[in-house]
């Protein structure tokens, strides 16, 4: 008889039940090695469309394709066994109609095996979120600063500084909650607003540049370990700097190759003795 203990994967229902409890730990993951490292630590692994910038070198997330998200999402699901895996829906894949959103979200879930999808938007997406959740697709919403709408918003800036803007964000939070989202990312939103809506709505809020009062926090893993330094948002805390470590390893390798000291005998195959 096998004594192997099967690890239970965290579900969207588990995430929703964490409202007001121990804060949720969320990080992005795009590749198999990172997913394996983060899986025991994180409640949610978010396959973010930020991969367009940190993996593919794009200037924004707007050119990320559905195929990219599916490929990376599948790798993260295959390489994790505990965390709830959520995949971002890229720009243009869900805004046209409820039917388009369902078709593409269903494809992402079927081809990746993820637990849920994430959509950016508030009141304008409430009908779509309801359409999806009624048909068995769990949705994580995303309000406040929405990177996919950065051009329409006039660039990256903190949201909610004026009362009309703050009330719009609170209205978005109420709308996506009523539509059936199981959680919501609150990005780049002034702390009093993020704190107030976290207390008001019944689903977990996951902050990024919002407030410690949110029900969880998310960061981009490449920001956290210093691998992405094209720019560093105010809300990023760098917990490690791997760039000099990787650079030093590559420099040492290059020096040994040029000196013909690598590969050494221990790294080569010899002829079998007769």
UniProtKB/Swiss-Prot annotation:
Q: Name one GO biological process term.
A: pantothenate biosynthetic process
Q: Which cofactor does it need?
A: Mg(2+)
GO CC terms, sorted: cytoplasm
Top-level class of the enzyme under EC nomenclature: transferase
- Where, by residue number, does Mg(2+) bind? 49, 88, 120
Q: Which reactions are catalysed by this chain? A: 3-methyl-2-oxobutanoate + (6R)-5,10-methylene-5,6,7,8-tetrahydrofolate + H2O = 2-dehydropantoate + (6S)-5,6,7,8-tetrahydrofolate
Q: Which residues form the active site?
A: 187
Its main subcellular localisation, reduced to a broad class, is cytoplasm
Quote the pathway field: Cofactor biosynthesis; (R)-pantothenate biosynthesis; (R)-pantoate from 3-methyl-2-oxobutanoate: step 1/2
* Known EC number: 2.1.2.11
Q: How is the cofactor bound?
A: Binds 1 Mg(2+) ion per subunit.
Which Pfam family is one of this chain's hits? Pantoate_transf
Q: Which InterPro entries match?
A: Pantoate_hydroxy_MeTrfase, Pyrv/PenolPyrv_kinase-like_dom, Pyrv_kinase-like_dom_sf
Which residues participate in 3-methyl-2-oxobutanoate binding?
Answer: 49-50, 88, 118
The function of this protein is: Catalyzes the reversible reaction in which hydroxymethyl group from 5,10-methylenetetrahydrofolate is transferred onto alpha-ketoisovalerate to form ketopantoate.
Q: Which HAMAP family match?
A: PanB
Q: What is this protein called?
A: 3-methyl-2-oxobutanoate hydroxymethyltransferase
Tell me which species this is from: Paramagnetospirillum magneticum (strain ATCC 700264 / AMB-1)
